[in-house]
């Protein structure tokens, strides 16, 4: 299982709407609003790195109102 945090910037005034929409996507375990450089943080799980990449492009970035994403895969040291 691969886990990642996805930091999201949204269009002005759309952060809550984006977080609600993303929270409904299968594979998302957390979607919360932030204050600062990013508007939403998402925790997502996938079966592989490739699946995670497809998930971000096909599911997360397809949500209206998103202007930029930064995906941070979790590593276990």
Regions picked out by a protein language model, each given a short descriptive name:
Residues 1-77:
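A compositional/biophysical signature of low hydrophobicity enriched in polar/charged and small residues
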